Amino acid sequence: MPDKSNLENNHTKICLLGASFDTGNMGVSALAESSIKIILNRWPDAEVTVLGTGVADGQHRLKLSGRDVQVKILRMRFCKNVFLRSHFCVLLLNAMLLKVLPWKRFRSFLSSINPYVGALAEADKVFDITGGDSFSDIYGLRRFLIFGFLQKWLVTQFCKELILLPQTYGPCTRPITRLMAKCVLKRAGTVYARDHSGVQYVRDLLANHNMNGKVRFVPDVAFVLDSREPENIDIGSLENVRTEDSIVVGLNISGLLFNGGYTQENMFSLKTNYRELVYSVVEFLMKEEKLLVLLVPHVFTPNRIVEDDPAACLEMYRELNEKYPGRIFLTRGCYNHNDIKYIIGLCDFFIGSRMHACIAALSQSIPAVGIAYSKKFQGVFESIGLEDCVADAYRCSQAEVLSAVGRAFDGRDRIRTQLTKIIPEIKTIILNMSEAWHVS
């Protein structure tokens, strides 16, 4: 069990799983930074280690509320070479050894020769956010096995309390994934869901288990992400063309949906052709003479073109710019999650197919519509009272999506007023979530 005095002084050690800064997905990066921000809000001098499946070990520097913060990045591996110090099997073996020989000196010895063991064995608290939405098998069984089950189960084998930060739970469509999900959720200390349907989903999974209030609702942590102006912004001539009367609409195009998912065969069972839908949305918007459209990517994966937003945005820009010259603008270049949030903040209205692109807008009180491909959109918008601002592309026809966009656009002033009131309250709830993390 954690040492109480250790948790209240400058030596608090925190391990964060399911987070990464190198996936190219700005939503995942936003979740990672926001999670660390919340942890440091509770323990300002904590030593934070991100134990993930990223590219390489190292240090990552953050600027949080004007303060420079450095976190350690360690990579857990699931490859064929089971003898690597960072391999899941090696870590599991060490956990078993510590169960048999639970001596403090032995734990210190193992931690000193293997930093990956130390990250878990020496941790006072362990948190996991599962990339926000990977506690589900909709992205494939292998991904759920690693992120949804094995990483979390490993924490419990080190006899550490696991706190699941606000995320989406389910759907788990296979009996085996439901069984693994139940195994993890039963052993977690606290389970935070970022939507009310997630709370109910977990309760239903654990129907015969005494939960004692362990399942709680807290909105998505990315609402507290800091916006930061990048040194260089390339959005064409938008700022020169824009006038006081202009309405700038940000449009985030998902490369994953644009290419039909990983299978490239409408993997998410959308009811309408996504490429045609995006084109129709822009044509619909262009009826407003003062309107300008800024295409904003949110996932940068040039080596995985099926997911890459910039490639999708560029293709659509070339097609649309010919028809609407001087009214379509493209965000070019590479940006981090803070930069992209700043760029989204330049818009008056936003439409996104990446949920965290929408959150970047909403958290700055910018009215937004989510073109959804999964249930996570509905839950997050619902958490701030904007469930009507979701257009489910997997249930709605093209006409229905356009109707939802039109209603939100017409009501943007009302939505902005609503957001201005509720967003500060949402941020306070998220940051104060840490007050429940009592010393064991």
Language model regions located:
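Active-site anion-handling motifs in enzyme catalytic cores
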Residues: M1-S440
